[in-house]
Amino acid sequence: MKEAVIVSAARTPIGRAFRGAFNNLQSPSMSSHAITAAVARAGVDPAEIDDCIMGAAMQQGTQTMNLGRQAAMASGLPVSVSGMTVDRQCSSGLMAISIGANNITNDGSSVVIAGGCESISLIQNEHFNAHRVADPLAMKHAPLIHMPMLDTAETVASRYNISREAQDEYSVISQARTSAAQEASVYADEIVPVTAIKLVTNRETGEVTEEEVTLAKDEGNRPGTNIEGLSGLKAVRDGGTITGGNASQLSDGAAAVVLMDGTLASQRNLEPLGVYRGMAVAGCEPDEMGIGPVFAIPKLLKRNGLTIDDIGLWELNEAFAVQVIYCRDKLGIPMDRLNVNGGSISIGHPFGMSGARMVMHALMEGKRRGEKYVVITMCVGGGMGAAGLFEVL
């Protein structure tokens, strides 16, 4: 049976949306930094690449007209390299890798690029096109399908009695883990430094100027975050529990991996990071989309004959602390195996990128720790969960 292995991976640092380093960097260009580095690390001839599959959650503006193809061209790949773009919201990057792997195992591809990108700065702004976004028939059958993500998190908190204190405590741990990981250069093997032209707005005059910046690490971590500071933050909704401190950050970034037929990788004496073993998705009520992983993970494990205890590392996207807590406790995931170097609360969450970032990090960290299996999982906007299984090599 054919296997699809990941032979290389690379990503940009994650920039803060709107005021961060990548607030003026278009998505094909941003993606090209990750793609070019991943291809170079794999040592493949670009002409061998069959397809470039990129995930993006908001496909308009700089991410419209097929980001996958645009990114391939921005990377200087031959015109023979095709491209496609995937939207499964926050699992788009993971979905792209799954599709790429299946192209190898089932359709005969030898080498595929897969990953994801999101520029919140250039899309989620005053130019965002929300014209006729709500379809009346979809709303008839699922009235809450467009419920704001923050409100779905508040629903999970109230419905399942998860306190503000518990959410803040989890967020402190996430920030501390990322801070320690950055101090130890844990993310260095993933990241490619990126130089970009940043827009800087003078708060007093409104004047916008350009500044060349080079970003070499994720911008979002807040070292020294403590429970006293988080507990003092005002909830976004009156009487609510979700704050800017216990929710994921709005971010910009891109990630890419090179997938290869396992036999070909062996013939070339490559040392893959891991092998794709499968993916599962599941739907849930849109108003509690954050708990989606509790439906997707059992599917994934059952299909592969595994249990929770068989998984050495878990990466769960941390859209909100409340949904991580619920999923962790409902499934019995040990905290010492979950988001061991932090997650979207402390690193950032470029929607289309996150799944691909989590895959590469889980495989690299799993290799460092000598683990066999890792699971990447996330809640998905609209009321879904997704989970992917990889074996560390």
PLM segments and residue spans:
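Active-site-proximal alpha-helical scaffold in enzymes
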Residues: D87-E118, A157-V186, A256-T263, R328, ...
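N-terminal extracellular/periplasmic Venus flytrap/periplasmic-binding protein-like
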Residues: R11, N24-L25, H33, E169-Q267, ...
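Conserved catalytic cysteine-centered active-site region
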Residues: A56-S110, H131, P143-D151, G224-Q249, ...
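Short, well-ordered amphipathic alpha-helical segments that serve as non-catalytic structural scaffolds
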Residues: S27-G43, L67-A71, A96, M149-V156, ...
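Phosphate/pyrophosphate-binding loops at sites that engage ATP/ADP/AMP, CoA/4′-phosphopantetheine
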Residues: A37-D50, V156, Y160-N161, A265-N269, ...
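Condensing-enzyme catalytic core mediating Claisen C-C bond formation in acyl metabolism
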Residues: M1-S27, T225-I291, F295, K302, ...
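Conserved beta-ketoacyl condensing-enzyme motif
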Residues: F22-V112, C117-A134, I191-L215, E288, ...
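Active-site pocket-lining segment
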Residues: M54, D151-E154, E190, I197-V200, ...
